[in-house]
């Protein structure tokens, strides 16, 4: 605690007789004496707090420390290590050397099903990601490899006899078609002939012919033309 003033300059305060009180020239001397004594008694040692410290005095308990920082060029990525049968999946943080290239595009390629595989609906076909030559999202077709007469057609392949996969769709393959349209051939749509026992409410059969030289014409055939005699 701070020092206590044990002297008084007032003669009416009841100071004990026989003891001489120190004399002060003014009130300012009293305040300076008390302040000097208080400042000496309120010195705080490191780690200790003085309850009698005066207001407005700053105390430092913890010095400022900087946190350690790593080099900014390090970049970390999460990489999973193969797990053993007993241990759980472990993870290790390693620098990532993977860099994406603007020229490389990936495509999904399905691997052929082996002959001894069972045709289960729950099992999906294995897939492998390989580099693709597709550029700009479109397949580049080389027209120089085929002649102008060749036309492409969709051909369904026959189902094998030992195939047990009823849920699988028929495979399809695009092959060159030898069919060539000639300008002299006329296209026509022929309706099936009406039987005699059919109702008379049905419209007459229709025959459509198309030629290069003329427009499309719609011809209605009468019963006499269909069944002569």
UniProtKB/Swiss-Prot annotation:
Record-linked InterPro entries: DRICH1-like
PANTHER family, alphabetized: ASPARTATE-RICH PROTEIN 1 (PTHR15880:SF0)
Organism: Homo sapiens
Coiled-coil residue windows: none
Region span, Disordered: 84-106
Protein name as catalogued: Aspartate-rich protein 1
Top-level taxon of the source organism: Eukaryota
């Amino acid at each position: 605690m701070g020092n206590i003033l044990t002297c008084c300059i007032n003669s009416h305060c009841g100071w004990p007789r026989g003891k001489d009180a120190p004399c002060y020239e003014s009130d300012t001397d009293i305040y300076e004496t008390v302040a000097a004594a208080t400042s000496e008694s309120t010195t705080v040692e490191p780690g200790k707090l003085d309850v009698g410290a005066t207001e407005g005095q700053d105390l430092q308990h913890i010095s400022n420390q900087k946190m350690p920082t790593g080099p900014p060029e390090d970049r970390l990525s999460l990489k999973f290590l193969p797990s053993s049968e007993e241990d759980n999946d472990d993870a290790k943080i390693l620098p990532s050397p993977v860099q994406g290239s603007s020229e490389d595009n990936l495509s999904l390629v399905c691997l052929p099903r082996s002959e001894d595989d069972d045709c289960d609906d729950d099992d999906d076909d294995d897939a492998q990601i390989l580099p693709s030559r597709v550029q700009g999202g479109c397949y580049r077709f080389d027209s120089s490899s085929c002649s102008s007469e060749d036309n492409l057609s969709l051909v369904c392949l026959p189902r094998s006899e030992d195939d047990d996969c009823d849920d699988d769709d028929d495979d399809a393959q695009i092959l060159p078609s030898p069919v060539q349209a000639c300008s002299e051939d006329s296209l026509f749509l022929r309706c099936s002939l009406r039987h005699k026992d059919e109702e008379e409410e049905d419209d007459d059969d229709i025959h459509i012919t198309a030629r290069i030289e003329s427009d499309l014409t719609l011809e209605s055939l009468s019963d006499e033309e269909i069944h002569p005699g």
